[in-house]
Amino acid sequence: MRVACSKILLMFFFFGPLLGCEDEMEKHYERPDWLQGSAYEILQGKGQYSQFLHAIDLAGFKIIVDGQGLCTVFAPDDAQFMTYLHAHGWSSVDNVPLDSLKVLAGNHIVQYSYKPDDLMNFQPNGVLNPATNPGIYYKHKTFGKDPIQVVTNPKTGRKIEVYKREKYLPVLSTDLFHFKKLADLEYNYKYFFPNSQWKGDNQFYVANASVIEGGNGIPTDNGYLYLIDNTLKPLRNIYDIVEDPSKNYSVFKSLYDRFAAITYDAQLSEKYGATSNDSIYVYYHNSLPKIASEWTFNYEGGFTENIQVASGTAFNAFVPNDAALESFIHEFFPAYQSREDIPLLALEYLLSNHIKSSNIVLPEEIKAGKVTTTYGDACDFDVDRTDVKEMCTNGVFYGINKVLVPAPFKTVTKPLFQHSEYNMFMNLLYKTGEIIQLTNPDNDYTLFIPRDEAFEAMGIRLNIGNADILGDEKFEKLNVEDGKYVEMTALELSDLVAMHVVPQKITDFNKQQVFPTKKSLTYIKVFGGGVAGEQETDEAVQVVPLGEYSNGVTYESEQLIGKTDEVLTDVLTNTEYSKFWALMKKAGLWEEINGVITIPMLAGETAMVFAPTNAAIDAAGNIPQDSASLVTFLKYFFVTLESNKVANYVMPGIGDDGMYSTLSVDVANSNIYERKYFELGLYQDVDNFRLRLTNDKGTKQCYTLSGKYPRFTTDGIIYQIETTDIQPE
């Protein structure tokens, strides 16, 4: 008996706490007293929401609202709901076409659960730092979406079925207005919703409605319920307004549709077209903001979701009406016979300057001059005189009566877009990402634009690829060995562009000068009324002024301006430098590896070489005969940029005057801890277009050949001097 009692006590000792724990778990999962049921049940209990619930039933959303899945419900009462139906010609819920009813009812149900604090200041990454961009993430995905739409493909004229995505519902909180430092909160809200009630600060407004007293964030079994004072009108997307025949934006639409990308979607076709064997498409626009989508995030970058972009990014549309846009096209594009002839690239800059993807832009910001377009131009239109002002599911729409001219149309790149004969160079600048850089208002540029035939003369052509897809173009050059065209590399394209862009203004082409291009250690020469590249030539490429702009000047060049492809040893082994090179060989300062001649002492560094002429060497009486002394003697004619920590060669008008370390070692002043090098003085004589050289003590001097450019190579430049008597003391 004692043993049995002991066993019972032990069992109670071990399992008693577990029984108590089970009671606690049951309490944890008990329905909280403060939950009042599903949103559907709560609305049923209130009595005056029967019309809204009837719409929910008919539209097929009862299962969601009644507890299956997280959702946030915004409910208008019977009076408000019927007022909306009557205003749209429906006498009862049963009279509303099912597709329209699904959109309307679904527009009141937001996916996922949002408590009041979330709607005031939604933070996609949680509430770790609620002060970050308060109110910016302002729109939320609903269950409302338009039915599959039959549209005409603007490229083919064929009828197709296009899938429409779920609409987003804007929730504008006064936190957003304060974050943007707006003074008149009511003005910014009622600008888009003039017939809605303003209920003051510290509120959020659900599109055209506000929350009524006692209806703010009622907890439900599967989310939250908000009682609102107005029926939420389903919002259009930006493209819906553009294609609305009652509005005046048909020109903008026709240009935008030049970029139409209507893509077959196998998954959507299987899901929505299975019964009718129909093909379902999605309607986007290549290279431009996807204003035909209800969403501002459309799986870009291969991601399936991006809440920050979906909730916080708006397509801010500043769309010019037909009269304004037609007038601009006629004035700016006189070289093109019709709108269809204008290149896609020009249209991309024009159109994207009117659709800014950013956080939502509100009217007071525009008034205050705080808003710029995609390319940094001022949004200088009168917001109170817009043709259309509308909050959309994917942004905001301002219908304006002027064109916001993009920066590339007003700066040194302007002629590219106005003249068809510059099409290749326009595309070249685009491919290399230079067009936007050339709009920088803080710089002065000189831009040389070759005509298309100049490219063709050099065996370069533009392969258009798919003419409907901007960016599919490829530059190709002729391979003279087999007569075939091969695609040019990114480096080749970059080098070609650089030789036509000088980061300063050039106005005098008769004075002999040299200018650095936008690429490090590449240069153009100016003389004889024109320009030349780095190759050795006595003939200048003639230029024709095209215009002077706020950030520089633009010229047409009759030929391409070329970059040298020679290296130092290619030039030094020429007859012109034969005596100097013979001394280099005698001193052992060269090496041949697999047929390639190199100068090992340069070790890949970039050098300025001051080579005595053949006549100077013949006349010299100071050339050492022993090898070691000859090495010291010859190295004094070499100055590398890297050892002197400078970024530019010294040329007339370029670089800094002063003493430069050569490669010649000053043995007397060197030790095992530090090696000293003899210095050579370099001083510009711009008037005579030459350099003056002095030895380390300034006791000897000589000049480079007057009026003669150095020889440019990819790894240095070579000046000729008329004496060897410049050695250090």
Q: Which residues does each PLM region occupy?
A:
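Sec-dependent bacterial lipoprotein signal peptides
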Residues: 1-21
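Mature, structured domains of secreted/extracytosolic soluble proteins
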Residues: 21-729
